[in-house]
Amino acid sequence: MKIGTQNQAFFPENILEKFRYIKEMGFDGFEIDGKLLVNNIEEVKAAIKETGLPVTTACGGYDGWIGDFIEERRLNGLKQIERILEALAEVGGKGIVVPAAWGMFTFRLPPMTSPRSLDGDRKMVSDSLRVLEQVAARTGTVVYLEPLNRYQDHMINTLADARRYIVENDLKHVQIIGDFYHMNIEEDNLAQALHDNRDLLGHVHIADNHRYQPGSGTLDFHALFEQLRADNYQGYVVYEGRIRAEDPAQAYRDSLAWLRTC
């Protein structure tokens, strides 16, 4: 299994040193912040060349969600995502992770009444994805549509929700990203959800049930990795979560070493 990581607070700030550190820890790739990539693309290229550590994907680094309630923010976000995809193409990255929104609204907390109808939600997200479909086609990249749990987003919560957008809009350059943490909240059966969407699953985020490092909680990574292998999953699995330990760096190393046994 190819395992990557997002940035962590204890990683070096210098870009080359960051890449060296991630490579030395034993990771196979780096999921970079989109803004960091765009603003430092030559340094990133140099770091990739020196270390051999690929930038697999981007996550974050733009302002405005593809399902934003505010049209100006949505359009601004699309422009920024376009630039990130162009930058990813320059450095050999595969694509960008995008949710419909994050932290914008939830039916689970007051006021519990959305300022937009569900049909309006579907129209905005679909319109955005059709725009990004063209960008991804032009740049040879992929948009990884991410379902989030019900407390962080109200529009796309399950892999089946993401699948519906892709199928109904006939999108060829949009795939699903499955995040074990969010899936553990929303899916009836994580392994079954992965299997049912194996044809569109292009990327995976991992954290344990409590959002901390894999191996420190209750998720059955052995079973989930077995499912991915059985379905011939060829993408990366990327650490996205926090670390709970007195020595975060050592705990991260230990988690990765343990995950390699799954």
Swiss-Prot record:
EC no.? 5.1.3.-
* Active-site residue list: 146, 240
Record keywords, A-Z = Carbohydrate metabolism, Isomerase, Manganese, Metal-binding
Q: Name one GO cellular component term.
A: cytosol
| Enzymatic reactions | a 3-dehydro-D-guloside = a 3-dehydro-D-glucoside
Gene3D superfamilies per the UniProt record, alphabetical = Divalent-metal-dependent TIM barrel enzymes
Which amino acid positions bind Mn(2+), per UniProt? 146, 179, 205, 240
Tell me which Pfam families the record gives.
Answer: AP_endonuc_2
Residue sites binding substrate per the record: 182, 211
Note describing how the cofactor binds: Binds 1 Mn(2+) ion per subunit.
- Cofactor requirement: Mn(2+)
The GO terms describing molecular function are: identical protein binding; manganese ion binding; racemase and epimerase activity, acting on carbohydrates and derivatives
Query: What family does this chain come from, according to its entry?
Result: Belongs to the hyi family.
Q: What does this protein do?
A: Catalyzes the epimerization at C4 of 3-dehydro-D-gulosides leading to 3-dehydro-D-glucosides. Probably functions in a metabolic pathway that transforms D-gulosides to D-glucosides. Can use methyl alpha-3-dehydro-D-glucoside and methyl beta-3-dehydro-D-glucoside as substrates in vitro. However, the actual specific physiological substrates for this metabolic pathway are unknown. Cannot act on D-psicose, D-fructose, D-tagatose, D-sorbose, L-xylulose, or L-ribulose.
PANTHER family (alphabetical): 3-DEHYDRO-D-GULOSIDE 4-EPIMERASE-RELATED (PTHR43489:SF7), ISOMERASE (PTHR43489)
Protein name in UniProt = 3-dehydro-D-guloside 4-epimerase
Organism listed in the record: Escherichia coli (strain K12)
Where is the organism placed in the taxonomic lineage, from the top? Bacteria, Pseudomonadati, Pseudomonadota, Gammaproteobacteria, Enterobacterales
UniProt lists the gene as ycjR
